[in-house]
Amino acid sequence: MEANHQRNDLGLVALTMLAQYHNISLNPEEIKHKFDLDGKGLSLTAWLLAAKSLALKAKHIKKEISRLHLVNLPALVWQDNGKHFLLVKVDTDNNRYLTYNLEQDAPQILSQDEFEACYQGQLILVTSRASVVGQLAKFDFTWFIPAVIKYRKIFLETLIVSIFLQIFALITPLFFQVVMDKVLVHRGFSTLNIITVALAIVIIFEIVLSGLRTYVFSHSTSRIDVELGAKLFRHLLSLPISYFENRRVGDTVARVRELDQIRNFLTGQALTSVLDLLFSFIFFAVMWYYSPKLTLVILGSLPCYILWSIFISPILRRRLDEKFARSADNQAFLVESVTAINMIKAMAVAPQMTDTWDKQLASYVSSSFRVTVLATIGQQGVQLIQKTVMVINLWLGAHLVISGDLSIGQLIAFNMLSGQVIAPVIRLAQLWQDFQQVGISVTRLGDVLNSPTEQYQGKLSLPEIKGDISFKNIRFRYKPDAPTILNNVNLEIRQGEVIGIVGRSGSGKSTLTKLLQRFYIPENGQVLIDGHDLALADPNWLRRQIGVVLQDNVLLNRSIRENIALSDPGMPMERVIYAAKLAGAHDFISELREGYNTIVGEQGAGLSGGQRQRIAIARALVNNPKILIFDEATSALDYESEHIIMQNMQKICQGRTVILIAHRLSTVKNADRIIVMEKGEIVEQGKHHELLQNSNGLYSYLHQLQLN
């Protein structure tokens, strides 16, 4: 009745869904009590105030249909008649709109005409204030500004060294001018000796300072690299499980590897070339003193370099994007192939896999070759501009010398100075591919670093839990346009109760436990432990107090002891052994040559499936969790190992709330209560013998199938 009443106020329904989309929990009745004063539903003003009270930033705008693809979605389409709906996605290519019908509680795809018929031009954009802060601090080139400020002393020293290098670079052409115009004309050998010694000293200082600058600069950029690498890994592990489920492993690895491109850029010559370019105004002043005409030729060439770069950069960026996409495909396919090597060998499909790899590799090589060709064209264009300027300067300079406006020494000095100006420009022009590549790398890496983590401000770390669990009016789907996985699930589990959950595949059994671990937040309803809403709880605090054993568990390439004591490496050995005995793992571990110090190999490859599963059970038990989840945990065990586990089940369950998910009904028949699920709903519950009495029930049907 309450759900139907809430469904009548579509504004309240929309607010609830948008708040939960932004990981904010709310009580609809409390919102209704505070803001729906006349009982007619939330008005526009009341809706905006209610959103503000939830730390949401909501803005009412009027937007033409043709510009809807530019707004941040999902957004609420506000209707004066109260028939509000959510706009989830705009498909501009096919003129279609993915919406969410709040009345029917289902996603809808509308054509252009259908959308125009119901759209009144009013939109409410919603974002969380935490995400606004995250967007302001997003990872891009500006991320390096605080790092530069942090190491400003080192960069200031680099700047000072660069100034001295430019002064030395200025002195050398002057020495050559003196030699050409004075020493050679007047045969001044003593002056020549002095200039030679001075020039040697300048060269030595220049080499030392240049090496010192490179060392100091590389040292500081290495620190920034360490900070970025550490930040990246911390952020990666803090991302919600949905981030990884929606992306290929190889694609994520490829994005993380883009850090290498940024590292090479930071420690390369590009940034020092920028510093050298900044001091070019000093050389221009001296060059102007020698010859304004020749200086104007040099100045006139600079826009040519810029225009050439502007012309070719967008093309290169598209080619680099394509190259990255092909590289990510290769990375994903390689990871998938190595991970599934047993299946590939067993099915003898290596030729087919090789054929697919060859095609993908050819596609990558082709895209890489196109990048190389374009980069070569760009570099040759730069060389053409440089050679053209050199010819013009030679012709004009010779005319000035012949007419007596310039001496030979001054012409040589001018050419040396112009070389000092053009050299960093050419280096940057030749490194423009690196700039483009780094820009792509920063964007790709930003996909990881700009994704919101699970850690939100204001999350509560509550006292040690007791084990009471409540699922209230739970409705959940993995994506807005995906089918409903859980629908109106209500379940109370008492502290210390052993609950079995059974049902057909896809009935929502495992999804229920994922909500309990706060991997996801329900679309509607609440998950509570000891009366505390998990949407408000710190995920790390919660998961440390829940033990989970899955059907396929992953062991790290460490010793058995380290795998069991993963959450607390300093754990006493007695606790590790006790947990291993409970899990039925101690006996086979003791028979190994190195016992608990045996390295299990990558993903536990050195152990059998049953052995890996028992170690995983020991790992879940070692922290003495108050809530224990067995999700098909014994399905991979042989009968002897399963018998050992079932014998110890009374000890395992003692003082804990236990949830057993199983297809084999023998695993759950001794549970205090058995929950039967079908199509996301609870259809039966009771003890084993009680459920068998209902001959028309699903549990009885599954029991008969297993008996037969």
From Swiss-Prot:
Domain Peptidase C39: from-to ranges: 1-126
Residues binding ATP: 503-510
SMART domains linked to this entry: AAA (SM00382)
Molecular-function GO term, any one: ATP hydrolysis activity
Protein name: Leukotoxin translocation ATP-binding protein LktB
Annotated transmembrane regions: 159-179, 192-212, 270-290, 296-316, 389-409
Claim: Zinc is one of the keywords in the record: no
Topology relative to the membrane: Multi-pass membrane protein
EC number: 7.4.2.5
Subcellular location: Cell inner membrane
Every ABC transmembrane type-1 domain range: 155-437
Domain ABC transporter residue range list: 469-704
GO cellular component terms, A-Z: plasma membrane; type I protein secretion system complex
PANTHER family to which the protein is assigned, alphabetical: ATP-BINDING CASSETTE SUB-FAMILY B, BLL6336 PROTEIN
Pfam families noted in UniProt: ABC_membrane, ABC_tran, Peptidase_C39
Entry annotated with the keyword rRNA-binding: no
Signal peptide limits: none
Keywords: ATP-binding, Cell inner membrane, Cell membrane, Membrane, Nucleotide-binding, Translocase, Transmembrane, Transmembrane helix, Transport
Reaction it catalyzes: ATP + H2O + proteinSide 1 = ADP + phosphate + proteinSide 2
CDD domains: ABC_6TM_CyaB_HlyB_like, ABCC_Hemolysin, Peptidase_C39_likeA
Main location: membrane
Functional summary from the UniProt entry: Part of the ABC transporter complex LktBD involved in leukotoxin export. Transmembrane domains (TMD) form a pore in the inner membrane and the ATP-binding domain (NBD) is responsible for energy generation.
